[in-house]
Amino acid sequence: MRRLGFACVVAVLMYTLAPIRAQSVYPTGTTIYEPARAWNGYTVLSPLQTQAVLVIDMNGNVVKRWEGLNNSAGGPARVLPGGILISASGARPPNQESLELVQQDFDGKVIWQFSHNEQIKTGEGSTIWSARQHHDWQRESLPAGYYSPESAPVVEGTSTLILTHTNRMQPKVADVMLEDDRLVEVSWKGELLWEWVASDHIDELGFAPDARKAIKAAQSFNKARGSFDWLHINSAHYVGPNRWFDQGDMRFAPNNVIISSREASLLAIVGRDGKIVWRLGPDFSESKELRSIRQIIGQHHAHIIPKGLPGAGNLLVFDNGGSSGYGFASPIAPDGVGAFARSTSRVVEINPVTLELVWSYTNPRFFSTNISSAQRLPNGNTLITAGAGGRMFEVTTEGAIVWEYMYPLFGGANASNAVYRGYRIPYGWIPQITRPTERAVAPPALGDFRVP
């Protein structure tokens, strides 16, 4: 890994001295809406502090709400055609994981559930089955997890890819108990079809000696959990049908899985034989192409844009910023953990074969230190969830904001309105609801905005 010297010091100053641009009073709900330029539909929200999944229309009205679900540990909720919901349920604090993945119909009737992954001890000492699911899951027929004109989501009888935890010792990684990341693919009946455990493949992940040393030291061991969340994989998607595979590049086989490791600043594709067949990061100084992309830090929601959408076949990533990565000791990372830092976020679209940076969105005031997502829409716009602040917005390829929404419900000890992810779906996917009227929202000029 290249020693960045002065650049690292600049990063430290930017991160530690950057002003916090968070006003105490601001409007919530839909604050900008241009119906003619937006891709109109319902938006599915996975709020962290609300034990429910919400669906809103373009004007921010709640049109559907499923209660008793746990977005804070299990991650994204998704709605499939017919008003079918799949979401996590049940928490296991202090572990960031859910007890089960549940599929419900529009009225809340359970159609499918998965929990038989591992047996765990509850706080009361009893033993129960748990999915140990965290951060992500995918249905085989909806590889990127969201709508495309060429997608045909299968509601029942299909397999599911689930990102889970498993605790294990692996001396090649560290000399403490790992909270390891394990991918499982299960049938509709809950049978294990395929699995992959991250720590078995540490030698394939591109870590330099300094990074391996920092990981081995395990300074981020979580005493409350009794384990070391060394990679913190936060997304796992099927690659899905794509032009690269059509042209003969087997790395992009549709049933391969693309993963994102927040802690390592690493993205990789896992082949069905378990081997890493493609990798981006962790060190973005390794080549001219990577230096052009620039270091990705603390990223979320890495996936291949599905066929049928503008940019199909390219990689789309919410690059959070904050700090992440393992490497050499520095003022910001005396133990080599969190070696890279940046105080702004960006969304990047990358050609995964040439590593060309195709498109990006950023702004000096755009920053979500964790969670968050980006979805490519059929009209070429991108729906961005800056999750830490509960903000969702739709931007054109030129960066114009044509829809913006601030989640209005606050909860938890920190009075947070954070939203893990948001997804835009067609109106027709929830036929039980009458299509709403779309009303433009033109915000006042900031200089004219006053609280009475």
Stretches with model-predicted labels:
Residues M1-R2:
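N-terminal secretory signal peptides that target proteins for export/translocation
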Residues G5-P19:
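Bacterial N-terminal signal peptides
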Residues A22-P452:
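Histidine-/acidic-rich catalytic cores in large beta-rich domains
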